[in-house]
């Protein structure tokens, strides 16, 4: 039996953020612990605890962080809910009308050398949009382009 993992590790520097990093940690904690009362007031006025769905309960969110004086380090070793993390970060950025961006990469790994066990992606977040990049999708697109070109070349 193989174990599959998704891992990431990235930092958000306070000097590069135009929003309080503490709001991100507060939201991560509130959703991980399902504690609506711990959500920032501005957030409660806009969204509810259920907006991130059941996947944000502690055993599924699997996101750790460490808030230091100069930066917020966010990481996961196993099975993070990347979509919820991205939603949390973007919610904070939208609230503060951020003009900055956050980006990070993630890796899909496996404890055995399974052919379907490796890959990864990246995400780019700003207050108005989120863009994901997935290596598996990219490879499939390249194969499709190659195959289509072969068909066109035969004509």
What are these model-derived regions, one by one?
Residues 1-35:
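Short, extreme N-terminal segment that most often corresponds to the first beta-strand
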Residues 38, 43-155:
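Charged interaction segments
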